[in-house]
């Protein structure tokens, strides 16, 4: 039965990867789309109003109001993609996969149709379309992440690969930009994306479960087209019993635990107010703010560094979008690192009698540290106003971002009880979304009082990035304390 279901599971894996790669995170290709919108004269009336109010406005800042409008749209959309993770996660938990995906398809298709029929006269509709596109995309990702549960020991690798595909999908807007330069209209491109909704519906009905894919995976588990061959009720009960047994083996110490060692998972609020969770929120929020501010203001930054030379701006915009595609290649390395270290530390725990769960949590510390280090390098390069250096900035940005979200999901999985994962994941994304709203006032500060000089803002954010190293340090110290003989005795 397992052999017959393997090709079906591989088909689910591959089509899920294509869905994340082609649709889920297209919002983060915003820079390419802004280039096209400017060519289409979106919000151009703001340039005329701004120039009229300033009287003697220079060519450098005469379109400041338009840049702020585009930045505001991206700020709202990026805020929505994180903040709505909490309610969309609840929808996924409560109403299961099929309902969540149908909602995603409705929002996504509505967004692409709105963009397709938007013009310079109705550009304000982007404030509605981009957040809908963001929420539909994140629901695609959330419903696909569970596919990792089908592949056991490769689970972390697949989860991080899907997060990398989510990042790489920003290259879709580069394709739209290149097609536009070859004469294909925005309307035609987004109508094509809208038609692809038929593919999403077909995949939802044929290749995805109606409910959730459990982890660990019970014996004789079937879904989608294979669900008609599902085992009878007795076998389902036996599979559920095996699932519970696997879960106990996954998280219990290699040593026999006495009743005193078996602890209740604790309430949701006890974990929410723990230092471990608080520092993780800081770690994610600071790094994510850097990425969102960079993506949302990149077009303006390139215009300033290139003295508003449209050809140079287009070249660097294309380079940035191309590097985003490689996120899907970078992210699995993070998952492989965590899977290998988890196996290594748990084997050591078996020999020494240490707590297995602490050993598993320890496996994410190198990934947390490496992500902070990559983000620091990205922040430093982004702060140096040298145009050719931005190629290095683009590379560091895509690598650090591809590590960021996979590491976030892995940490929450290992650091907190599984029954609270959905709520904690949604909460950490919602809190980081609130912090991400700072990108618009920071952009306004740079464009206004700082007169297009982001030096002081960049220095402040670089210093904040240094704070993210505290998180892996504290997690490592906690793991060492739990693995000590005094703790496990």
From Swiss-Prot:
Residues bearing PTM Phosphothreonine: 258
Signal peptide: none
Organism: Bos taurus
Membrane topology designation: Multi-pass membrane protein
Family matches, as InterPro entries: MFS, MFS_trans_sf, SLC43A3
Name this polypeptide is given: Equilibrative nucleobase transporter 1
Family membership: Belongs to the SLC43A transporter (TC 2.A.1.44) family.
PTM sites of type Phosphoserine: 253
UniProt keyword annotations, A-Z: Cell membrane, Glycoprotein, Lipid transport, Membrane, Phosphoprotein, Transmembrane, Transmembrane helix, Transport
Pfam families from the UniProt entry: MFS_1
Physiological role: Sodium-independent purine-selective nucleobase transporter which mediates the equilibrative transport of extracellular purine nucleobases such as adenine, guanine and hypoxanthine. May regulate fatty acid (FA) transport in adipocytes, acting as a positive regulator of FA efflux and as a negative regulator of FA uptake.
TM region positions: 17-37, 72-92, 102-122, 123-143, 158-180, 277-297, 318-338, 358-380, 402-422, 426-446, 455-475
Residues with attached carbohydrate: 56
GO-annotated molecular function: adenine transmembrane transporter activity; fatty acid transmembrane transporter activity; guanine transmembrane transporter activity; xenobiotic transmembrane transporter activity
Subcellular location: Basolateral cell membrane
GO cellular component, one term: basolateral plasma membrane
Catalytic activity: adenine(out) = adenine(in); guanine(out) = guanine(in); hypoxanthine(out) = hypoxanthine(in)
GO biological process entries: hypoxanthine transport
Gene3D superfamilies, per database record: MFS general substrate transporter like domains
């Amino acid at each position: 039965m397992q052999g017959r279901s393997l090709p079906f599971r591989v088909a689910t894996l591959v089509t899920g990867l294509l869905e994340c790669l082609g649709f889920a995170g297209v919002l983060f290709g915003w820079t390419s789309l802004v280039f096209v919108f400017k060519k289409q004269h979106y919000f151009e009336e703001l340039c005329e109003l701004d120039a009229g109010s300033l009287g003697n406005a220079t060519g450098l800042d005469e379109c400041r109001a338009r840049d702020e409008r585009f930045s505001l749209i991206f700020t709202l959309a990026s805020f929505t993609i994180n903040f709505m993770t909490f309610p969309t996660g609840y929808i996924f938990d409560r109403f299961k996969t099929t309902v969540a995906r149908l909602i995603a398809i409705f929002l996504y298709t509505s967004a692409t149709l709105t963009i397709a029929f938007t013009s310079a006269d109705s550009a304000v509709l982007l404030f509605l379309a981009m957040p809908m596109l963001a929420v539909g995309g994140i629901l695609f990702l959330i419903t696909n992440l569970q596919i990792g549960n089908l592949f056991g020991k490769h689970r972390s690798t697949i989860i991080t690969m899907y997060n990398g595909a989510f990042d790489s999908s920003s290259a879709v807007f580069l394709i739209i930009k290149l097609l536009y330069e070859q004469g294909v209209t925005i309307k035609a491109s987004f109508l094509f994306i809208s038609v692809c909704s038929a593919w999403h519906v077909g995949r939802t009905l044929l290749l995805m479960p109606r409910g959730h894919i459990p982890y660990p995976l019970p014996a004789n588990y079937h879904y989608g087209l294979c669900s008609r061959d599902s085992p009878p009720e007795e076998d389902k009960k036996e599979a559920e019993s095996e699932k519970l047994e696997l879960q106990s083996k996954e998280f219990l110490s290699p040593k026999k635990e006495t009743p005193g060692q078996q602890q209740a998972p604790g309430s949701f609020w006890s974990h929410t107010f723990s230092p471990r969770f608080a520092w993780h929120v800081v770690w994610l929020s600071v790094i994510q703010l850097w990425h969102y501010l960079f993506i949302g203001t990149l077009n303006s930054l390139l215009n300033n560094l290139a003295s508003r030379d449209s050809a140079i701006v287009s070249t660097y915009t294309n380079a940035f979008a191309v590097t985003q595609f490689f996120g899907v290649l970078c992210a699995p390395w993070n998952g492989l690192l965590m899977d290998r270290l988890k196996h290594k530390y748990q084997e050591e725990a078996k020999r020494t009698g240490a707590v297995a769960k602490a050993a598993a949590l320890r496996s994410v510390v190198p990934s947390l540290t490496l992500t902070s280090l990559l983000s620091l390098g990205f922040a430093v390069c982004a702060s140096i106003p040298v145009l050719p250096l931005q190629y290095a900035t683009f590379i560091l940005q895509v690598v650090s971002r591809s590590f960021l979200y996979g590491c976030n999901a892995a940490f929450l999985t290992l650091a907190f009880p599984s029954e609270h994962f959905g709520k904690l994941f949604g909460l950490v994304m919602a809190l980081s979304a609130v912090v991400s709203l700072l990108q618009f006032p920071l952009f306004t500060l740079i464009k206004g009082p700082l007169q297009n000089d982001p030096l002081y803002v960049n220095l402040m954010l670089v210093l904040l990035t240094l704070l993210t190293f505290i998180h892996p340090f504290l997690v490592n110290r906690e793991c060492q304390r739990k693995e000590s003989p005094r703790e496990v005795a």
